[in-house]
């Protein structure tokens, strides 16, 4: 049996726009992938990474089609096969882990039903064996309560947990080819280490071939044997991972590598603000009235200040944002805005309260109406809050698109015609349209490539300096926190472990073991970093972090 599993020859993919015109989005790409090998596909949003990944299964998104070239899988040209043959192959011999797990699960079905569906439907194994296999994978992917988590619905697990469930779903049938499209995007740094190590080990044990699509160069350094750099649907260069990251030949690759070090310098601000924009006072919150997911939280955010909220998946970061925005009334305590108590429930707040507190969500796929154009999505707050219509609204939409570095032609596109990064930028523009006093940024850069993320952070910083807007910045990317936040709040299982100026939090030695664990988990752009962490820093990840009394 040949070691070569996948080969693409002169692959071409075209997309049809709303005006009917076609645009080539992948142009004559050649690719080879052997069994047991991981090829990283990197590049900016719109580079064609996900399109190439889907083409490995002879599949194209709605509005796109493969117009030329060959996709040879285990000796068979998939472009010559009928749709029924391709359906039998997809999910069984080749599996895809999507960038947005939230948009990939049926909210009305339990997780086990969806994870086991392909294996049962294709006759790969019985229902009993499929569930047993799913539970085994849940454990390997470090999901809590692996024996019972499959009986939950998608909304009953965190975003990071749902992403790992999707990884289990892809691996259930033991495919020859795994296509991983940003599989750790939604994961906190400590979970990311565990999942990266597990996925890498499973690939090695099963001799899988894998396409690993990512914009995070530090992540791809830990798992890829080779890297292919893409730009505007064309290959820029390809080579061993260490060579591409440390000695690239092409100027564009050098730009990608340097973009990861692009930072916004932090402003040292130790003192708490005297007149905060938002004050969270003694807040306790619960979804079911029995289990508290937030416990007596006190946080203040001042005018023109960036406060980062960090912690692992399930620590309560996004729940805290829901309390501030009124989506989840607290069981105890309250939130003040500019010194006045805010109504706990969203429906009781004034239109001006709603305008002044905006939120950018973690999952852009579920935050936009798929049937509305970009202009309609951005224009809605312009009409609702300011009464703008017609040409005035259209002009303001174009201005907002320019602020987020998107061409005016995007105004008429639908969300399904955008890349992951483009979708998130539209969500940012929608928040900016309301001209708020504070924006709650929930993983705002997690779906963006390094170059675009750096641009967005600079944009947010520029807006803050010009308008004194405040940011509550929820993230698991501590590299971002270190570079943009004035103060940092560390959370664990609904408690605040510690909070203070970002400089103090990140300057060793850390006061709390849990904070030290988080900081030690930030990936570095070295190919040996993951092995070094697992070998030399293992004691950190065995800590049963206790929240101070």
Where in the sequence are the language-model features?
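Conserved ABC transporter NBD signature motif
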Residues: 65-77, 333-344, 353
């Amino acid at each position: 049996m040949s070691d070569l599993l996948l080969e693409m020859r002169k692959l071409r993919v075209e997309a049809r726009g709303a005006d009917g015109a076609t645009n080539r989005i992948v142009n004559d790409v050649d690719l080879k992938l052997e069994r047991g090998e991981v090829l990283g596909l990197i590049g900016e949003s719109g580079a064609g990474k996900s399109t190439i990944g889907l083409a490995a299964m002879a599949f194209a998104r709605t509005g796109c089609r493969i117009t030329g070239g060959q996709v040879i899988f285990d000796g068979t040209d998939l472009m010559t096969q009928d749709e029924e043959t391709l359906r039998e192959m997809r999910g069984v011999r080749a599996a895809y882990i999507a960038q947005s797990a939230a948009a990939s699960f049926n909210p009305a079905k339990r997780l086990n039903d969806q994870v086991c569906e392909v294996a049962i439907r294709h006759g790969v194994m019985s229902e009993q064996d499929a569930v047993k296999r799913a539970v085994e994978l849940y454990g390997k992917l470090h999901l809590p309560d692996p024996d019972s988590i499959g009986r939950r619905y998608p909304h009953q697990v965190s975003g990071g947990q749902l992403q790992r469930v999707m990884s289990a779903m892809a691996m259930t049938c033991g495919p020859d080819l795994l296509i991983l499209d940003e599989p750790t995007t939604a994961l906190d740094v400590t979970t990311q280490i565990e999942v990266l190590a597990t996925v890498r080990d499973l690939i090695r044990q099963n001799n899988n071939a894998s396409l690993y699509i990512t914009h995070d160069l530090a992540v791809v350094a830990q798992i890829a044997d080779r890297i292919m750099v893409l730009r505007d649907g064309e290959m820029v260069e390809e080579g061993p991972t260490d060579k591409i990251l440390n000695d690239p030949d092409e100027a564009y690759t050098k730009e990608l590598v340097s973009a990861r070090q692009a930072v916004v310098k932090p402003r040292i601000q130790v003192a708490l603000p005297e007149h905060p924009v938002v004050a969270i006072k003694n807040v306790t919150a619960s979804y079911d009235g029995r289990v508290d997911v937030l416990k007596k939280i006190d946080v203040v955010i001042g005018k023109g200040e960036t406060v980062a909220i960090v912690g692992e998946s399930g620590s309560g970061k996004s729940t805290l944002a829901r309390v501030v925005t009124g989506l989840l009334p607290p069981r105890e305590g309250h939130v003040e805005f500019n010194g006045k108590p805010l109504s706990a429930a969203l429906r009781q707040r004034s239109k001006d309260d709603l305008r002044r507190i905006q939120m950018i969500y973690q999952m852009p796929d579920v935050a936009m109406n798929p049937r509305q154009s970009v202009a309609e999505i951005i224009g809605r707050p312009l009409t609702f809050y300011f009464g703008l219509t017609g040409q005035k609204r259209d002009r303001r939409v174009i201005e907002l698109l320019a602020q987020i570095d998107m061409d005016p032609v995007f105004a008429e596109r639908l969300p399904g015609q955008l890349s992951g990064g483009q979708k998130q930028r539209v969500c940012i523009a929608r928040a900016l349209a309301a001209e708020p006093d504070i924006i709650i940024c929930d993983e705002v850069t997690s779906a963006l490539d390094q170059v675009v993320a750096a641009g967005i952070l600079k944009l947010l910083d520029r807006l803050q300096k010009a308008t004194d807007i405040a940011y509550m910045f929820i993230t698991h990317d501590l590299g971002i926190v270190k570079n943009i936040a004035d103060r940092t709040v560390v959370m664990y299982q609904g408690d605040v472990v510690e909070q203070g100026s970002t400089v103090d939090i990140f300057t060793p030695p850390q006061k709390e073991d849990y904070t030290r664990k988080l900081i030690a988990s930030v990936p570095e752009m070295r190919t040996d970093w993951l092995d070094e962490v697992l070998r030399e820093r293992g004691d950190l990840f065995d800590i049963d972090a206790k929240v101070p009394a």
